[in-house]
Amino acid sequence: CRLVGSEMCIRDRDADVILIGEMRDRETMETAIRAAELGQLVISTLHSPSALGALSQMITAFPEDEREIGRMRVADTLRAVVAQKLLPRKDSDRQIPAVEVVRITGAVRDCILHGKPSEEIIELTEQGSAAYGTQTFQQQLESLVEMDLVDYEVSKAAATSPSDFELIMQTLSDERGRLGEVPVTGEELGA
């Protein structure tokens, strides 16, 4: 059954998992949420530059007068949002994904419900990396540079905030220098 906003696919199939290639319109998002409300696992894609951008797109797909209910429905059904950017590897012609993972924990759910700023969700995502396996693009980009897999300038350009990325990388490099370790970004940071 092709799920193109079709309620029939949800009702007529006893599927545990529904895969939606891409949620391009409100009708498809509405159907996906309804399926999740019925207990089915729904996996889909959405074109967005970040996990928070995808979350925002889902909420703003609801008309203004339904947005509060939309927030509740999204917060109640969403379990995680994963975003990726493909970056060129330093050591080959291949690409490597920089991945952002936002799990919908109780605290993140509250942020969605109450329309709190995305900065709070980013902070919760950073703090939850050990407990929930979450990470921001910033954390992933730092890690890729530290592991010498991606060029510093490429990571900086891919960062949500290049100036913040540069400041954090400089701070990490300074801390390592004080400890007698190799700077985070090697020779590139001095450039």
In which residue ranges do the predicted regions lie?
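Conserved P-loop NTPase nucleotide-binding/switch module
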Residues: 14-86
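Conserved P-loop NTPase
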Residues: 77-191
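Alpha-helical segments flanking ligand/cofactor-binding loops in enzyme cores
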Residues: 7, 30-34, 142
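Single conserved hydrophobic/aromatic residue that forms the stacking wall/gate
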Residues: 1-5, 9-10
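A short alpha-helix capping/helix-coil boundary motif
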Residues: 10-12, 35, 118-121
